[in-house]
Amino acid sequence: MRKCGEDFWLHSRFLRKYKKNTIALFFCFSLTFLLMTVLLILLHTNFLISDLQAKTEFTPSDCYIDGLDNAQVENLRTDPDISWIAIEQGEGRIYTRNNQQAYLIRGDELSATMMAGVVEGRLPENYGEVAVERWVLLNLGIEPVIGQTLLLTDFENGKEEEFILTGILSDIYANKRYGLMQMHTGMEASSTESLLAYIKFKDQVPYNEKVAELQAELEIKNDSIKECPARTNYRSLYVLEAEIIGVVLIVCMVVFYGIYRIMLLTRLPQYGMLRAIGMKRKQLTQMVLLELYEIFFISVPVGTALGIGAAWLILRISGDMDQHIFLSGERAEVQLTIPWLAIGVCILITGGLVGSIGLVSASRAGKQRIIEIVRQKNGGKKRTKNSFSIDNAQSKNGMILRMGGKYLVCDLKTMCFTVLTVCVGVMLFTGLAYKARTLEYYRNDTRELSYLNGQYAMTMLHYNRTDQGISRENAEIIAQTSGVSQVRTSSSLPVRVIDNKAVGRNEEYYDELYERQMEIYGYSDAGYDGKDQVYKSFLNGYNEEALRCLKPYIVEGDFDPENLKDNQIIVSVLRMDQRAGGGLPGPYKEGSPMMDYHAGDEIQIKYRNDFRTDTEEYENFSDTDAEYTYKTYKIAAVVSFPFMYDCRHTVYPLLITSDSYLKTISPGSAIQCMYLDGDPALSEQERNELEGTLIRLGSENASISTRSLIDEIERNEMFYFKRMVYITGIALVSLLLVIMNMTNTLRYRMQTRTKEISMLRAVGYTRRMIIKMLLFENCAMGAVGIMLAFILSWPVLKYLHSDSEMLAFGHSFVFESAGFLIAAAGALLVCIVLSFRVPAEWKTRRIADGIVHVE
């Protein structure tokens, strides 16, 4: 036998002759690389987008240092490891105009544009020049026209100051989300106030080591350097990357092995003949690997290119590339991030696994006796069971079932692999369906817990009297404004709650809070006021629409939003997320409550008769001569989240009643929070006009911040949409791979028995009887795979549940029945459809060809 070039010629001939197997393997590899490439690109691109969005809220710096002097700042500016540094001078000063309050931030140019860009004009160069966001100008009653002089009143001394508007900044996400109005100006040259420095290190600079070095150089305390919450953390990306690659490799290798095993078994007789005429085992192994890798190397560029194209299309459809994100004064372009290194590693790992499978398979084939390979015994043992003996058949259908059972156990390896394929496919689809459900919960929770509870928000940054906020007359005008469809309101009355020591609480947290507040303010939110042991809270009056929105957050008890009695109260209690190991209290449904109130308990409050709660005497519990009214309520329900924005961020329980009842207690109370929705039929121009109208109406009341949250809501919706696209894409590609594997496996099972089936057809078996037998076999394997998937899906879904935040927010584990049933029905449907694909050799006119068929 010729050795040079002959192996290459033979393996190419095999690839051309067995086109179906070659095409199946090509599609398997191509879809694998397509799936890997899409997932890796989208994972890295989304990580970039999430990182950019976090930086728009928490600054793009790595850390910040407060309390510096000019010499220390100059030392930082000359540090070669620092990429940039932004400086702010002293504390923000409060200025008022148009009944609104805005903070004046003194700093360098970079401090103004860390999270924004200049939309129009220029940045301030000196103190007295200002750059402001457009929505802030509108709230201050100022038209956004560059070059005009602004008259603002200093909140501290009441003096008017002139400022020149030199620039208009893009919206800063955090400011708009919480209603914080800021103006940026230059630093005062004569000021001796301390400086705040935001620092960004150069790439590859080790963070912890550099922080320790700066602490020593600047001679500051260990805790003086604070890490920015949005500092890029690649570790989470790499962990998620490894998890995704692992899952994809497992699924794709299972499918590949199924297809390749059939391909190998089909060619074994030819391999046996080659061995018989002198081919060595090593040559056989080389030829097998050449076949595999020729398909593999053609599939790599095809699958990768298709993956890049699919990822680009998804990002284009999702609108990510059109996002306007400004950082460090420039628009941060969202571009396709192709992780070539990760893709290359995946290709190498896949190539190694493919080669290992091919090497092991070729070695096994080479070790078999040549005569067995030629006769296609494949080293296997024919397995028969007495229970499937045809002699025991009582009817024609009984004989069909027994024949099907006999064929099932004759080739246990193929049967087991078919069952495994069905199991993996059903489990994967069920897991993806469950992940889709968790994403829907996450979307809703994120929207509500981020206070994106209305298209327009009118809130306060701070209040300490019940008559501060939107007057009720003005609130009525706002609610009746053309274009407004829904209104939710909250009015608050500062109260003191009689502290019942019998009520359990998080003693450790409240003790730390008490010490911290005493150190900073000299008083705390809890203490003895001369008559009672109390803690400060608020009695919030919600309108009927806002009360309805509380229903999903009920932890215990119940209430009627339309008929909440005057002696009933709803208590909003924060909890500690035990799964996260403590941390800060949050609006969790599960976990340890900050105070252990229950539905049916009584709670007593008291409030000042004159409602003068904006004095220092009230805050430090020294107003012993004031008159108070006592009220006792019965807790109707305990909720985990107050829904309406609490700008005071109260960690003690909030008390909620109906707005109509609160008005009877305090007729002069105002509205501190309003959420409004516009008419769905409004155009973009009409929505902008409505925003302007609401800003004008809101500015008629002191300290009210009015803004549109439509962009923020759409951002949250887009995040959900993208994730659903990924899940759908994974499901479709995986479905194609599983169907391809099942088709090849079941077709192989039919081809290997062509001779026997043709003999049965010759003695009277009809095509319908053969199809019945195949239906029994395929559906039996499918049913076993489905049952196995049902058993294994429970721990997998429970892991997904525990790994998410669903439990913390009150979403208990529920098996994904709908997704499982759809996957099971789909698997059985594939088994049924493939049962009707009878080979041509089994047809009546080709029975003779089938009897002499060489497999």
Model region roles, listed by residue range:
Residues 1-34, 47-50, 289, 382-426, ...:
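N-terminal Sec/SRP start-transfer signal
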Residues 44-231, 437, 441-727:
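Basic-flanked hydrophobic alpha-helices used for secretion and membrane insertion
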Residues 21-25, 31-59, 414-416, 424-453:
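Alpha-helical transmembrane segments
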Residues 231-246, 250, 273-395:
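Hydrophobic alpha-helical segments
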Residues 2-6, 364-385, 752, 841-855:
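Short cytosolic juxtamembrane segments of multi-pass membrane proteins
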Residues 18, 254-296, 737-780:
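Interfacial "coupling" helices/loops that link adjacent transmembrane helices in transporter permeases
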